[in-house]
Amino acid sequence: MTAHTALDGLTVLERGWLSSNNILIHAAAGEPGAVLVDTGHVSHAEQTVALVRHALLGERLHRIVNTHLHSDHCGGNAALQRAFGAPITVPPGNADAVASWDTMRLTHATTGQSSERFTHADTLSPGAHVVAGGRRWEALAAPGHDPFSLMLFDARHGVLISADALWENGFGVVFPEIDGEPGFDDVGAVFDAIERLPVSVVIPGHGAPFTDVAAALARARSRLDGFKSQPERHARHAVKVMIKYHVMEERRIGHDALLQWAAATPFLLAAWRLFGGGTPPREWCARFVDELIGQGVLAREGDQVIDR
């Protein structure tokens, strides 16, 4: 996308899929410093610190705000806190889990992901706002992908930081559905809420900023309808996403070690209990590894599975 004037004063560090995008909102005159939204994966933490330091150009990092606390959005928190001393703001529903560092409630342990403990200074509730870059960013509830997830909306310029609630081509895995809780209707309600907003440009959690919001919503709704009509399709997608994500984190892993990880990961086991059909969990997970290799998303070299 050609640079949009609504993004003036923002630096979007587009990362990929293992790490979320990092959005640096540069300080306007009279503000105490820049605000960073989301910090990527822990395995990229040193790179994130370097990227943020370069983008700051000597400016002070005043605060870090997390849209939600999945491992790909908060993994750089601790490293950035050490490097810049910036306080961290989290959604209120996550505050107790952060304070006690309950990795099960944070979903890092349930999804088999790595994380580094950090401390938070305060919370940002839906309906509250953050002033950064001379803009008023309203926090909007965005449950579905994560029950406590937030979006940030600058109504004056029409900029929506959507996290994983909406990408240009899809949206994040609806984790509650695998845990036996409703989530699809929440996702649809968030789409409806986005449609009612005067959005000119979306900064997603993954992928480049985009302006054709109507087309993105149409694609997302079509995908959601497919998942609602065939919940097993969503579960299969979720399992493959998590396996791919783990291999991205490891870069290369033994086939047996990957299956051992998969068959012991609570989130994948929850999907297996719903749709495994009596197949042993290790064998069931092996099918998804084979599918990912067949699709060219992963590769097999001897006994090693490698990212592609």
Name what the model sees in each region:
Residues 33, 63, 86, 158-159, ...:
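The start of beta-strands in P-loop NTPase/AAA+ ATPase cores
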Residues 41-43, 136-143, 147-231:
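Metallo-beta-lactamase
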